[in-house]
C-alpha cells in the first residue's frame, strides 16, 4: 500500500485524501497540546511557511495515547494550535498511533520505518516521518529532534 492511498479527517471533520499530495513531500508527526515538546508546533509552522510553496505538506496528528496529554476536543485542539502557535498547516482529528485502533496510515509508517533499536511502536508525542514525493518514507525522527534540525533532509527530498 502507498502512503498516498490513505485518507484522514481534519480537526473540522473534512475528509482529506493523501493522494492529492502525490508528487509532494510530506512531514507527518503526532502531536499533543500538553506535552513538553508542544513548542515544536511553532517550528513546524515556520517550516511550513518557508517550504509549502516548494512542495512540502506538513500534517499534524493529535494523539492522546501518551500520558493523556491531548485530552481536548478537536475544536479545542484547533483553537489551541492556532492561538498559541499560529498553525496554518493541516491537522487531523485526534487519532491513535499505537494499538489495535491505530490509524492505518500510522500502521504503515511504523512498519516501513522502524524506530530506535528496531522498534515499530511510537514511543511518545512528536515522532516525525519525512516522506519523499514518490511516497518513500525517508526518515523517522525522535520526539526530541527539533523540526528545524530536519531542514537539510527536507531540502534534499524537495530537490531530488
Question: What name fits each language-model region?
Answer:
Residues 1-160:
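Chalcogenol-based redox active-site neighborhoods
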Amino acid at each position: 500500500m502507498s502512503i498516498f492511498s490513505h485518507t484522514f479527517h481534519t480537526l473540522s471533520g473534512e475528509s482529506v485524501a493523501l493522494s492529492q499530495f502525490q508528487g509532494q513531500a510530506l512531514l507527518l508527526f503526532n502531536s499533543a497540546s500538553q506535552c513538553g515538546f508542544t513548542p515544536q508546533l511553532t517550528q513546524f509552522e515556520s517550516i511550513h511557511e518557508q517550504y509549502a510553496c516548494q512542495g512540502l505538506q506538513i500534517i499534524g496528528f493529535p494523539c492522546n495515547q501518551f500520558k493523556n496529554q491531548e485530552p481536548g476536543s478537536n475544536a479545542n485542539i484547533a483553537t489551541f494550535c492556532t492561538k498559541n502557535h499560529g498553525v496554518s498547516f493541516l491537522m487531523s482529528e485526534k487519532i491513535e498511533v499505537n494499538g489495535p485502533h491505530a490509524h492505518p496510515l500510522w500502521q504503515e509508517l511504523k512498519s516501513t520505518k522502524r524506530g530506535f533499536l528496531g522498534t515499530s511502536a511510537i514511543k511518545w508525542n512528536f515522532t516525525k516521518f519525512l516522506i519523499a514525493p514518490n511516497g518513500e518514507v525517508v526518515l523517522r525522527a525522535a520526539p526530541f529532534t527539533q523540526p528545524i534540525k530536519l531542514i537539510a533532509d527536507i531540502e534534499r527530498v524537495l530537490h531530488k
